[in-house]
A protein has these predicted regions:
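Sec-dependent bacterial lipoprotein signal peptides
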Residues: 1-15
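Bacterial signal peptide processing site
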Residues: 17-20
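N-terminal, intrinsically disordered, polar/charged segments of Gram-positive cell-envelope systems
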Residues: 23-38
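A structural detector for short beta-strand units
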Residues: 53-57, 82-84, 108-110
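Tryptophan-anchored aromatic micro-motifs
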Residues: 34-53
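N-terminal glycine/threonine-rich, aromatic-flanked beta-hairpin/loop signature
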Residues: 59-87
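N-terminal beta-strand/beta-hairpin edge segment
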Residues: 82-83, 92-94
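Beta-sheet ligand-binding and adhesion/scaffold domains
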Residues: 50-52, 65-67, 93-152
Length: 152
């Protein structure tokens, strides 16, 4: 009788251990959490303030989609501010910027190279399409001439 009880106890113990092992092995949220934490979060406030010039870029990111607000207050130039909607690909925000300057509503394309600490505006040849200024070749923009906005 004791042998049967020992065998039954051993089976219960092994079954309990097997179930616990299966639970741990099938728990994938840990893997996805690690993967997501290595991606750069570009959401936040980027700011430049120097020599009477102020540029503020507020970015909200959802996957590859991005939106936010942008304000230019450059010394001795007209202030413009508005909102943008676009996408982030390979650390570059490419978006349509709708803004108001001197009471006139306009739209143009903007590009910023984003890092976890800064944003630099991209420059390149533009053309007007349907009343909106867009980059001729968004993949061939220069970022070395832009002002560096620091992430706050």
């Amino acid at each position: 009788m004791k042998k049967i009880l020992y065998c039954f106890g051993a089976i219960v113990l092994l079954t309990a251990c097997t179930k616990k092992t299966q639970k741990i092995e099938s728990n994938d949220p840990v893997t996805s959490t690690v993967t997501n934490s290595t991606q750069t979060d570009f959401s936040g406030l980027y700011n430049y303030q120097q020599n009477g010039d102020t540029i503020t870029l507020q970015v909200t990111v959802d996957g590859t989609k991005a939106n936010g607000n942008l304000m230019y207050a450059l010394n001795e130039k007209d202030r413009n501010s508005g909102s943008f909607v676009g996408e982030i690909k390979d650390g570059v925000l490419l978006a349509n910027y709708t803004f108001s300057s001197e009471g006139i509503l306009s739209e143009r394309q903007i590009a910023f190279k984003l890092t976890d600490t800064s944003a630099i505006e991209g420059y390149g040849e533009v053309e007007e399409i349907n009343g909106k200024m867009v980059f001729k070749d968004p993949t061939n923009l220069e970022y070395d001439k832009g002002l560096v906005l620091t992430k706050k």
